[in-house]
């Protein structure tokens, strides 16, 4: 069938993802190729000290994004969008959307970005002996209880953004396990065919005196946990009108479990199998490694535990700083060239990046005895609440552009490696391959450096730019899979079997160079500390 026939017959699959700056919709065909898309640009607001998105804008954004998708389909294929084989909603994880029994929002949406739940996070992490970050839904929920907030007594349901939108469309109070793992810790059933909130943690939470007085039960307040591929309900008449106010969309469409952006990222990079992982490296950087078993201990503030969309534990290392500092240096150098040659005669910024970063491959093994810290903000992993970008050199340093650029590229990975060393050295976690996405990987050098820093092969896929909404559309397609393969088999055999990718193995010379830098980086943290205290 042609794409037009696939769409008109209702056999395309839809993924919609609420990102922090854009809501995006992607329609895919039976070959998992994106064939139409829509988007809506938005920004969070800081209101009364709370990072939030207005509930009306959430609704408007969804409808505008869908209308943009309809328009794209009409323009490309001259088809009016009326149905899908399956659809799914994903969104930024965590946060707090609290409703009463009549579905009235009790307080403005508190997003993952808020750092207002420190007391709850610390108390729960200690209670569970399990990392419960400030951004998790249960941290927000418990903090509201600790604060004696007026709305708490009226709470009937707490959702993530994806679970809330799914409820609006289907009337089903359910959530995909990956998204659920950012609300409250989860666990497999004995047969590994289902997942739920960890029973012993639920009991401990509900036994807290401050929780008991309200009679809250986690499994009543939080959505029911579903695995990837499960039936998560169907689009209702009201849901269809809500998504498409023009009235063309039909009710009865199958919906898959709503997921979080971490889970859709894993799917989009084919990183759901044990011993695999993915790295997103841009302004900030995080790695996610699928575990074969639970970690031996908790590492609050350093390693978070979430799950794949089919319930396997994932260790997440998140760092606030990656390419931001070397972007400033690039712009600084570009300004020098523009001043000397005139902006009309100087290279465009993309070419400028490529040439300078590739020049770093000519650097000395010890990076010329240079050192840099890219701490535009604090870095929890290395113990900094705030940061100061630094460039330091010894008196006998070989200060040239190749060494300078390499140390900037290595600095982007220093804190990430500190977190990964816990997995490698303390927990003995095996990692056979990782897949990268983001600006750090735009050059061959970036891919090489990441492989050496992570001590494992790292690949960049040609599909990496498709991102979360494409991953959500794949999860929607997976929910219709008649063969009921495992998610990893489905991705390997159906989606990525012929996917082109560029893989970099750890290079012996560059690996030695990184290790020399890394030892200097750890020793030099005292310099960074002095800068924070003095400047």
Question: What do the PLM-derived regions correspond to, one by one?
Answer:
Residues 64-84, 148-152, 201, 205-218, ...:
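Phosphate/pyrophosphate-binding loops at sites that engage ATP/ADP/AMP, CoA/4′-phosphopantetheine
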Residues 18-20, 128-259, 373-374, 405, ...:
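Gly/Ser/Thr-rich active-site cleft segment
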């Amino acid at each position: 069938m042609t794409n037009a026939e696939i769409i008109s017959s209702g056999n395309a699959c839809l993924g919609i993802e609420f990102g922090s700056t854009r809501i995006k919709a992607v329609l895919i065909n039976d070959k998992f190729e994106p064939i139409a898309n829509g988007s809506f640009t938005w920004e969070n607001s800081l209101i009364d000290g709370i990072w939030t998105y207005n509930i009306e804008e959430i609704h408007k954004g969804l409808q505008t994004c869908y209308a943009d998708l309809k328009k794209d389909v009409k323009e490309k294929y001259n088809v009016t969008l009326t149905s899908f084989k399956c659809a799914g909603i994903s969104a930024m994880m965590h946060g707090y959307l609290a409703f009463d029994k009549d579905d009235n929002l009790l307080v403005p949406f508190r997003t993952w970005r808020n750092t207002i739940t420190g007391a709850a996070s610390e108390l729960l992490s200690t209670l569970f002996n399990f990392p419960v970050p400030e951004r998790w839904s249960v941290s927000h929920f418990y903090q509201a209880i600790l604060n004696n907030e007026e709305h708490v007594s009226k709470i009937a349901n707490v959702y993530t953004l994806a679970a809330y939108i799914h409820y609006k469309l289907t009337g089903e109070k359910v959530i995909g396990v990956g998204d659920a793992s950012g609300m409250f810790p989860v666990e497999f059933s004995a047969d590994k065919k289902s997942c739920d909130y960890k029973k012993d943690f639920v009991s401990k939470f509900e036994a807290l005196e401050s929780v008991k007085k309200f009679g809250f039960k986690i499994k009543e307040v939080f959505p029911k946990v579903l695995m990837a591929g499960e039936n998560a309900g169907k689009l209702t008449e009201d849901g269809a009108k809500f998504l498409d106010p023009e009235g063309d969309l039909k009710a009865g469409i199958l919906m898959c479990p709503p997921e979080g952006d971490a889970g859709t990222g894993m799917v989009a990079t084919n990183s759901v199998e044990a011993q695999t992982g993915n790295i997103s490296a841009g302004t900030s950087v995080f790695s996610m490694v699928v575990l074969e078993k639970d970690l031996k201990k908790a590492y609050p503030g350093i390693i978070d535990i979430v799950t794949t969309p089919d319930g396997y534990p994932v260790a997440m290392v998140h760092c606030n700083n990656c390419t931001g500092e070397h972007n400033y240096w690039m712009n600084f150098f570009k300004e020098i060239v523009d001043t000397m040659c005139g902006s009309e005669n100087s290279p465009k910024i993309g070419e400028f990046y490529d040439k300078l970063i590739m020049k770093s491959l000519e650097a000395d093994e010890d990076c010329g005895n240079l050192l840099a810290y890219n701490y535009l903000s604090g870095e929890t992993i290395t113990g900094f609440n705030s940061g100061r970008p630094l460039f330091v050199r010894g008196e006998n340093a070989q200060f040239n552009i190749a060494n300078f650029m390499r140390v900037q590229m290595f600095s982007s990975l220093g804190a990430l490696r500190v977190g990964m060393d816990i997995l490698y050295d303390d927990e003995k976690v095996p990692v056979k391959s990782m897949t990268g996405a983001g600006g750090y990987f735009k050059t061959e050098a970036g891919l090489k450096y990441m492989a050496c820093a992570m001590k494992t092969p790292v690949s960049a896929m040609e599909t990496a730019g498709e991102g979360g909404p494409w991953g959500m559309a794949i999860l929607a397609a997976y929910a219709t899979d008649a063969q009921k393969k495992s998610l990893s088999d489905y991705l390997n055999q159906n989606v990525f079997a012929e996917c082109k990718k560029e893989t970099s193995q750890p290079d012996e010379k560059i690996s030695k160079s990184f290790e020399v830098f890394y030892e200097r980086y750890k020793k030099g943290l005292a310099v960074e500390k002095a800068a924070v205290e003095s400047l």
